[in-house]
Amino acid sequence: MKNILLLFPLSILMSLPESEQIGICTNAIGEVYRSGKIRSGKIRKGESIYNGDKISTDKNAFISLLNIQDKSVISLYGNSVIKLFGSAEKDSIKTEINIFGGRVSAELRKTRNRKFVVNTPSSVAVVKGTTFLAGHRTMNDHGPKYQGVSDCVFSVLNGKLEVQNTKSGKTIKVEEGKTVISTLNGEFLIFETTDEFTQYFKEPK
């Protein structure tokens, strides 16, 4: 209990206020919306993205944003929902994406003292200097190597990332050119990253 009490104030110090701008929309196609403490409604190119914003896209929509803290580029594709957070203390920066559904890609710079975390219903991924694709598929979704259960898919285009399955507690390092499927059953399935995975991460024309 003492440890919990000590950590709680620290987390408050590290979290940016919800009024803090953490990004800017560099491109928006179709119906893209957000709900947040500062603004809610449709997102347009050039608008600010704030700490804690929940962003959603319609079927054929797309949004790309620049994280002004760590200069990472984050893209969200059709039928997707995420929540974006940023925190900072002294020289360290942390970016956190919660994926509730759909597909996200990110291109990260190799920056010291920066942590990038992706949370999904079945997994937590820690990323450093990596270009990757991430998606959460429900039981009603279909796609490559579909297992018939809710799962999360991570594809590494360059660099590497570490994924922990929250059901089993198992951790796996995913190298460049590999794709891992992490299931709610606690399993990891490894594949080569091919077009059958990347075809779902394209900007609509």
Regions found by a protein language model. Give the residues of each.
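Sec-dependent N-terminal signal peptides
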Residues: I4-L13
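Flexible, surface-exposed loop/linker segments and immediately adjacent secondary-structure boundaries
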Residues: E18-K54, D58-N60, L66-K205
